[in-house]
């Protein structure tokens, strides 16, 4: 049997070493003192996302710290590979990818030998459909696989198959009648606090047991309460629901909304995996899939995902933050890193722990600041994958005595940028379309470019803010906010000039509309009281007449 705790199947990179190597899960602390493993090295970015969740979930389930005191001890003195192996072994039977008994993330009750051959044929699918962005039946039938072609992943090795299986179950979209979505919805965003080594990354995202107990029913402690494939499946033919009270909290990492069975076959001569390109003892060509798997509802929260409050909700329930089409950038700082009071978005539990609970201990260990890794698919109805988001942003901690001023200043910077972005979009629309036009142009690329253009300066600005506040020297925050506003003003006008006359939006332009829209934009940029109030700045006294005169001035070029 192929066991995911015993086999060396996880691709990683060490501090020194050009080629990736493959390790078993317990080897993540191997060579910490000499040549540590620093990151995952899968052939696909979504597999890296799946593997880090796999490792975090495994440690959280098998050897979590009892409290924060134990967490600190193991951060300073990590367990050896042998110690991890001993802790993981208790759950070894849950990680067989094949065999006659329970199989990793596969339905125990889906007995293929008991199914009529004709019915069995109906639920058999090519293995490429295990990969989320691959074309499905309808797309193939209608010959719409223009970009991602069918038949490009006919052979998948057991290692890539395990990663693909975890990816699907963790991000499961609605795949038709009875195909349930993942425990966090159809497009969950995952946020990971990154460490200096792979072990640090895993451990920084572990929650102590005292805190973790609230995420499920602690009295549900059987293996099947943690790993649903270890017992009979809680199917949902009659819309039966599985709430957080029906399972152990560890199931957040091991959810099984789709009922799947993998078939491993001995490899033929010279057969290589179509994903990683390596030969393997076993390959997967087809798998079996049926509907009405576990229907996760009611109170599930995940420690790696931000949540926002449900509006007009009587029970104060939270909704998992979903991945978006236009990527992840500094505009998501509010919600991913610090609380967003406007949208009532809360960062993931592990981010809160890093910034609020563990920051002093980590500072003493030389880790006062690090990075946040945010990733996830954006999937819409019909299992249509729009994009995979994969972003990294700085994760900074500051002393408690300046944290309020630091966070309120960042809030001002981001909200002011959001206000200008919205006005820019509105004015470009005014420039290219008449008021009577019923067209609805997609200007999302304008917004995306605005965030990309301003991102480096945002990080430079908050770094200056951090250094100034942390050094306890007098610092004129007004000057910093004025510089930020001046930069946004120039970027907005430059973007307007670029796109309002661009053939990529519309083939005909009206000069009068463009001038009027530009005047409107300048009025907002240099005279809107709400914009200046957001930054605690005094609004300059400028008349509309002077604004029109300024149109003749050459705008600074933004490179």
Regions found by a protein language model. Give the residues of each.
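Extended alpha-helical scaffolding segments
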Residues: 1-141, 164-559
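Non-catalytic, well-ordered alpha-helical scaffold segments
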Residues: 154-155, 200
